[in-house]
């Protein structure tokens, strides 16, 4: 009788776990940086997890020929991404795009550099309210140093200025 209860419990746990919708998808390929700071990997648009990239003025990198122009965060991402990018998909958005934690310069022995953290520590992104604590700490450090968007006026779409 005891053996039967253990097997029944095991089967129940397996059924519950298999019915949960878990995003374990990982994409790894060359990434194209879109004007809004999203990435295009394998024909999928990926928003970087935990951050909002505010609109900034258009700048041009004239050290390249032809000059590369775009939002400051997009230019920073293009500078950082020199090879393949690996993204761990966290969720799918209603428009079909994905949200994920993306890493550049990764290897078998190193997970690489978190692109959301990279933008936050340079001041080109804002941590969302539900972002990890580390992201909020990086945002505060960039803000205290007056880096990136903290030197110019921006809109924070999730904060009501009339409160």
What does each of the following model-derived ranges do?
Residues 1-10:
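Bacterial N-terminal signal peptides that target proteins for export
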Residues 9-19:
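Bacterial N-terminal signal peptides
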Residues 21-163:
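Small beta-barrel nucleic-acid-binding modules, primarily SNase/OB-fold domains
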């Amino acid at each position: 009788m005891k053996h039967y209860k253990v097997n029944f419990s095991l089967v129940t746990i397996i059924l519950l776990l298999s019915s949960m919708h878990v995003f374990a998808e990982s994409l790894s390929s060359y990434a194209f940086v879109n004007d809004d700071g999203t990435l295009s990997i394998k024909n999928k648009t990926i928003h970087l997890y935990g951050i909002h990239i505010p609109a900034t003025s258009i700048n041009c990198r004239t050290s390249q020929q032809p000059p590369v122009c775009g939002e400051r965060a997009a230019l920073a991402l293009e500078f950082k991404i020199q090879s393949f990018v690996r993204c761990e998909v966290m969720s799918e958005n209603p428009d079909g795009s994905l949200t994920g934690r993306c890493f550049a310069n990764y290897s078998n022995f190193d997970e690489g550099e978190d692109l959301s953290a990279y933008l936050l520590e340079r001041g080109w992104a804002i941590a969302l309210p539900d972002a990890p604590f580390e992201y909020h700490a990086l945002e505060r450090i960039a803000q205290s140093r007056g880096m990136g968007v903290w030197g110019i006026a921006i809109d924070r779409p999730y904060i009501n200025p009339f409160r």
